[in-house]
Regions:
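Short alpha-helical segment within the catalytic ATP-binding CA
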Residues: 20
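Aromatic pocket-lining residues of Rossmann-like dinucleotide-binding sites
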Residues: 24-25
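Short beta-strand "acidic-cap" motif of Rossmann-like dinucleotide-binding folds
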Residues: 31-38, 43
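A general beta-strand register signal
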Residues: 73-74, 173, 192
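A conserved short coil-to-beta-strand element within the FAD-binding core of flavoproteins
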Residues: 174-187
């Protein structure tokens, strides 16, 4: 990493949270000087020997869990499109705001090439029958539409997102581990 110290925003980690943080910042305030620091590699350099050898060789850093897009880069890529699953965001922001943000995130994935098909909402008759059986068994069925990215398409989507951030002026320092966050007068002022 060079010695430049005049960044407006420093984002630690290039997983989905870091990616979407940078995306929103450049959309809302394109003049910001943004640095993203990631301990792993760029997406195009994330290669795991285990794919061919079938044995983990203990790479440091691990290309499966670190690098641009984080652990999700090589996952099956299923996006849950309901606030009813996945955590307590609705409790924090309210149900409607959580749903709005899920749709906003989904729109970004669509913009960068996600398949438009959504699974789980087209078989209402079958869903009603499963719901009836669940109630009879004292269970609650939670409907959750799913957008399936797929491993290969997810990789392409994240590659396009990486290119978008770079071409929009976000500086990404790969293979860089943050050791500490500098605090001055109670505010984050930099990183080591």
């Amino acid at each position: 990493m060079n010695n430049r110290t005049d960044f407006d925003v420093i984002i630690i980690g290039a997983g989905p949270s870091g990616i979407f943080c940078a995306y929103e910042l450049i959309k809302e305030r394109p003049s910001l000087n943004i640095l993203m620091v990631e301990k792993g590699r760029p997406i195009e350099k994330r290669v795991c020997p285990k794919r061919t050898t079938k044995v983990c060789v203990g790479c440091r850093p691990c290309s499966i869990t670190t690098g641009f897009a984080g652990a999700g880069a090589f996952s099956d890529g299923k996006l849950s499109l309901s606030p009813d699953v996945g955590g307590n965001l609705p409790d924090i922001l309210g149900y409607d705001k959580a749903l709005e943000l899920i749709h906003e995130s989904d729109d970004i994935y669509l913009k960068f090439g996600a398949d438009t098909k959504v699974y789980g909402g087209d078989k209402q008759k079958e869903i009603q029958e499963i719901r009836r059986r669940a109630i009879m068994a004292n269970l609650k069925l939670i409907e959750c539409p799913i957008r399936h990215l797929g491993t290969e398409e997810g990789y392409k989507i994240y590659t396009r997102l990486q290119e978008h951030l770079l071409s929009s002026g976000v500086r990404i320092e790969f293979n860089t581990m943050v050791q500490d966050i500098l605090i001055e007068d109670g505010c984050a002022s930099g990183i080591l």
